[in-house]
């Protein structure tokens, strides 16, 4: 099948790390299905894997491998992906940069130090979730952002003088726009901790 013939794309892509490595601590989709699907539905698909002075370059058309080569390089370690959707399947398609850039920026917030180049625009976060809050806050915080980071969880929060609440929650690198039990638990325990600290009855 077309997807079977595109296995080289998945092979190149999976060389970026191992499932048990820190590279996959906050990743969504580790089985390569996504990259195979994009490959099969693209008139042109190219993936380059830069590692330790070598680069492996594979190009495809509609899932069919056209070229696969390895050569020396002086580029830094990283991955380059290019794809052009198959116009016979996606008629009059268009990309909405504002949605794509938001998604990519979220990835950099969750993976501190990760640099993503999107159509020539460099997206990078040095301070993770602290940058997320600073970039999205429309009012000055009442106190410096509190940032807690553990092996499997990271939290950053503050309060402003504005009314209302705003949350950015993620699970396995995916923005959970509708919240979830993880967000509900966070809200409940923040309120409970404040209540216990001040020893007052508060509704939450």
Segments (PLM) and residue ranges:
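Single conserved hydrophobic/aromatic residue that forms the stacking wall/gate
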Residues: 2-9, 13
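GHKL/Histidine-kinase-like ATPase module
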Residues: 98-101, 105-107, 113-204
